[in-house]
Amino acid sequence: MGTTAITNGLAARDSKTPIYYIHTSGTGILTYGDIDRFTYGELSLKVFDDWDGVAELTSLPDHAPHRNVDKLVLNAGNLDPALVKTAIVCPPCIYGPGRGPGNTVSMQIPGLAALTLRQGHGVQVGEGETHWSSVHVQDLSDVYLKLVEAAAAGGGDASWGAQGYYFAEAGDIVWGEVGQLVAQIAHKHGFIDSEKVVSYSADEVDAMHAHGSMLWGASSRSKAIRAGKVLGWVPTRPALEETVEDSLLIEAKRLELVPGHAKVAAGDA
C-alpha cells in the first residue's frame, strides 16, 4: 500500500527538518452508520464537523471505509509532531470539471448520469432521502493550495497532526432530488422517454453499479469549519445542480448516445 510506504518513510527519517504530508481521505468514511444499520436511502440527521467534532473523526470505528488508511496517517503524525506534520483532507461528493492532464471527471454524478442513461429512467436508492455534502473540484483544489502555502511558510496558521483534519463542502444534496434532476435533463435532451425515477434496493443498485448503495444511498453529511477558520477558505464555484447537465452530456457522449437514442444495454457501458 502506498500510504504504508510513505508513513514508514516518514518514521525512518533521520532529519531535524520538519516535513509536511497532506493526505486525501473521503467522506465515504462517514457512511459506516447506514452501512451497519442497512438504512440505505433514509434520512439521517447526523452531521459531522471538523472543529468541535475533530476528536470523533480521528477515532471513528476501524471498520469505517478509509479508516485503516486514515489511522496510518494519524499515527505518523503522532510519532514526532514537531518533525512530521500531517493533514488529512476529506472531500465529500466532488463535482465539476477537473483541470488536470488525466482524469477530469469524478465518480458519483457521472456514475448516476450513466446509470440513468443505461436504465432508461432515473434512479434512486430506497426512499431517496439520503444526504451527502458536496464540493466543486476547483473549490476543493483551493484547500490543497492553501495547505501547501501554509506548509511552505513553516506551517502557517494551519492545523496539523491530531487537529489537522479538513472537510471541504459547500452544502448538502439529497440523492433522490439529484436523481430526479438527472432524469429531467436526460428526458429534455431526448435520451430517455420520461422523467420517471425508479427506486431500487441497496442490493439491486449494487448489481447495476459497484458500491452504488454507498455512493447514492448511505448518508455522508459533513460541515467544513476548519478550512475557513485557519486557512480562510471560502467556496465560490457553481452549485452542484448547475453542473449536472454538463456531466450528463459528457456521459451521453462517452456512451455514444444521440438525442432520441434508445437506452444502452448495461453491459455495453
Show the residue positions of the predicted features.
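NAD(P)-cofactor binding segment of oxidoreductase domains
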Residues: 1-49
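Active-site Tyr-X1-5-Lys
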Residues: 53-89, 94-97, 106-110, 114-117
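Glycine/proline-rich active-site loop of Rossmann-fold NAD(P)-dependent oxidoreductases
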Residues: 82, 96-110, 147-165
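Conserved loop-to-helix N-cap of the C-terminal "lid" that shapes the substrate pocket in Rossmann-like
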Residues: 88, 103-109, 133-141, 145, ...
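A conserved pocket-lining segment of Rossmann-fold NAD(P)-dependent short-chain dehydrogenase/reductase
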Residues: 111-138, 143-147, 158
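Non-catalytic, hydrophobic alpha-helical segments
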Residues: 140-144, 168, 178, 227, ...
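Terminal hydrophobic/aromatic helix or amphipathic segment near a protein terminus
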Residues: 157-158, 165-223, 237
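Amphipathic terminal alpha-helices
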Residues: 237-269
